[in-house]
Every structure is written in structure tokens, then in C-alpha cells.
Amino acid sequence: GCSKRDLDDFYAALEEADLVVIATPVYHLSFPAPLKALIDRLQRYWSARFILGKRPPISKGKRLVLLTASGSGSPEGGPLLEKQLAPPLTVIHAVLAERVHAVGADSPDFEPAPYLEAARLAAHRMV
């Protein structure tokens, strides 16, 4: 485990959660560093599964909603983050239930309304 026990409250909340929402910008077709660091700190669940053989490492299953925003107009960012999230989702007993990937946010012509509506509809499907 990590030498610092600074995420104990986070781990407890994660283990009890029914739903996890990740809302993040896409930086260079990846996660920003603070989110990547948090994902890396899920190592305790990876170790529980693959070293200790505990399957699933978190007994309570959960659904995950991924909301991304890319500055560029390229649609690649959100789906790449989905692929990067796939392994950590298995060890936290989560399935990607909904996703909304906003693209072109840096454009002066960017219109957020369709993405906000898609996120609203995704939220309604989660309840």
C-alpha cells in the first residue's frame, strides 16, 4: 500500500458508492495529472485482485458516468479515455454506464447546450 493514508475517506466512499461520476478535461488525449494520480492510487484494489486473488476487490458494484471536454474538434479524446479507464474499472467493480464527450470547447463557435442536454439525460437514466 501507499505510505500515506490520505485517501481512506475516499476509499470508503468509493466502496459504498452506487454511482461514480468522472468529469474531466482531455489533455493531450489523456487525463490531467491529478486525475491520473488518483487512478494510480487505486493500486490497492489491483493488488487485492491480482496478488491476493480477491474477486471482486470491492464487493459492491457501481455504474460510472464519464463526462469529458476536449478543446480540439477531434472526437478521439473521450473514447481514448474510455479505453484507459477500462482496467481500473474492473478492479473497482464498475461498469461504464454513460458517457458524454464534448469536443471543440476551445472554438469560438463552441455550443455547450447539446452536451449539457446529453449529460442531463444521462443523469436521468442513472436514477
Model-derived segments and spans:
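Short, basic, helix/turn surface patches
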Residues: 1-7, 54, 118-127
